[in-house]
C-alpha cells in the first residue's frame, strides 16, 4: 500500500519535500513577499493588426435583443438580420444549436449604422427590438437620439398643421371637372410667368451694355464687311473722277490749240508767232526770230 501511495502521489521538488507524515500546500509555503508581477506584452506585426481589427469590429457592432417565437431558428434569424450563425452563438454563449431552444430571447449582433438599428413604431403582435449596447457611452448617447427624434417629430407636426391651414384657406371645391381643370391651368400659367420673370435679365446690365446677341452680330457684320466695301467703292469713285478730270482738261487744251492754229492760218500769220499755252496754263510766247523773217518777206 505504501508503494502504491508513493507511486500515485505527485513528486515535489527536492527543496520542497514535506517532512514525514506532514502535508505541504503551495499556498501556505509562498509568502506575501513572493508576489509575481505580470506585464502585458505589446503586440507587434500581424498580431497587432488582428487585435486592432477585432477591436474596430467590436466598436462598430451593437446587439439587438429579440424575443424568440415559435418557428424561429438560428439560420432563419441569421438570414433575417444578415449575420452569421457563429456570431450569434458567440454572443449568446451557445455551444450547440439545441441550446437555442432553451432561450426566451436572443442577442443579435448587427452593425452600428444600419437600417436595423433605426427606431420604428412596431405594430401589435410583432417583435420589438431592444438594442443592447456594449459601452455606457452609447447608452448615454441614446437620450440625445430620443430628443433629436422628438424635435424632428414636432417639426413634422408643425409642417402638417401649416399644410392643413393652407388647404383650408384655399377653397378648391368645384362643381364639375371643367372648373377644376381651368383652375389648375390658371395656377400653372401663373407659375410659368413667375419663373420667366425671374429668369429675365436686366436690360441695363453693364457687362454687355444692354445689347442682345443679335445686335452684337449685326455690329460685327457692319464693321467687318460693310465698312470695307464702302471704302473700296469710295476709292474707286475718286480714281475715276481724277481720270475723267485729266482727260477733259487735255481735250480742252487740244481743242483750243487747234482753233488758234486755224485762225492764224486764215489771217496769214504763221503759228510761230502764236502764243504757247502749256498744260499748266502758263502763257509763253515763241521766239521772235521767225517773226523778223516774216516781216522781211512782207517788205520785199
UniProtKB/Swiss-Prot annotation:
Q: Which GO terms describe its cellular component?
A: Golgi apparatus; plasma membrane
Please name the GO terms of the biological process aspect recorded for this protein, alphabetically.
Golgi organization
Is Membrane there in the keyword field? yes
Q: What SMART domains is this protein classified in?
A: LysM (SM00257)
Residues modified by carbohydrate are: 149, 170
Location in the cell reads: Cell membrane; Golgi apparatus
Q: Tell me where in this chain the LysM domain is found.
A: 64-108
Task: Report the InterPro entries cross-referenced here.
Answer: LYSM1-4 (IPR045030), LysM_dom (IPR018392), LysM_dom_sf (IPR036779)
Recorded protein name is: LysM and putative peptidoglycan-binding domain-containing protein 3
Biological source species = Gallus gallus (Chicken)
Its taxonomic path starts at: Eukaryota, Metazoa, Chordata, Craniata, Vertebrata
- Gene behind this protein: LYSMD3
Amino acid at each position: 500500500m505504501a508503494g502504491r501511495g508513493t507511486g500515485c502521489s505527485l513528486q515535489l521538488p527536492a527543496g520542497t519535500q514535506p517532512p514525514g507524515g506532514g502535508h505541504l500546500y503551495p499556498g501556505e509555503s509562498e509568502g506575501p513577499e513572493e508576489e509575481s508581477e505580470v506585464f502585458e506584452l505589446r503586440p507587434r506585426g500581424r498580431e497587432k493588426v488582428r487585435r486592432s481589427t477585432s477591436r474596430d469590429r467590436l466598436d462598430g457592432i451593437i446587439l439587438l435583443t429579440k424575443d424568440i417565437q415559435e418557428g424561429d431558428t438560428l439560420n432563419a434569424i441569421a438570414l433575417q438580420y444578415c449575420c452569421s450563425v457563429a456570431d450569434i452563438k458567440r454572443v449568446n454563449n451557445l455551444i450547440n444549436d439545441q441550446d437555442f431552444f432553451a432561450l426566451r430571447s436572443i442577442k443579435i449582433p448587427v452593425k452600428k449604422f444600419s437600417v436595423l438599428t433605426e427606431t420604428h413604431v412596431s405594430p401589435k403582435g410583432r417583435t420589438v427590438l431592444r438594442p443592447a449596447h456594449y459601452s455606457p457611452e452609447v447608452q448615454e448617447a441614446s437620450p440625445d437620439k430620443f430628443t433629436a427624434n422628438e424635435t424632428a417629430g414636432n417639426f413634422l407636426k408643425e409642417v402638417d398643421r401649416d399644410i392643413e391651414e393652407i388647404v383650408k384657406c384655399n377653397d378648391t371645391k368645384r362643381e364639375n371637372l371643367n372648373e377644376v381643370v381651368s383652375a389648375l391651368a390658371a395656377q400653372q400659367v401663373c407659375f410659368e410667368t413667375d419663373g420667366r420673370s425671374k429668369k429675365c435679365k436686366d436690360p441695363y446690365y453693364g457687362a454687355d451694355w444692354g445689347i442682345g446677341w443679335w445686335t452684337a452680330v449685326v455690329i460685327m457684320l457692319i464693321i467687318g464687311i460693310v465698312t470695307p466695301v464702302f471704302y473700296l467703292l469710295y476709292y474707286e469713285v475718286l480714281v475715276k473722277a481724277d481720270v475723267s478730270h485729266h482727260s477733259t482738261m487735255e481735250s480742252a487744251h487740244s481743242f483750243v490749240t487747234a482753233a488758234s492754229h486755224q485762225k492764224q492760218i486764215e489771217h496769214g500769220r504763221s503759228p510761230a508767232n502764236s502764243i504757247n499755252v502749256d498744260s499748266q496754263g502758263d502763257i509763253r510766247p515763241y521766239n521772235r526770230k521767225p517773226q523778223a523773217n516774216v516781216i522781211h518777206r512782207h517788205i520785199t
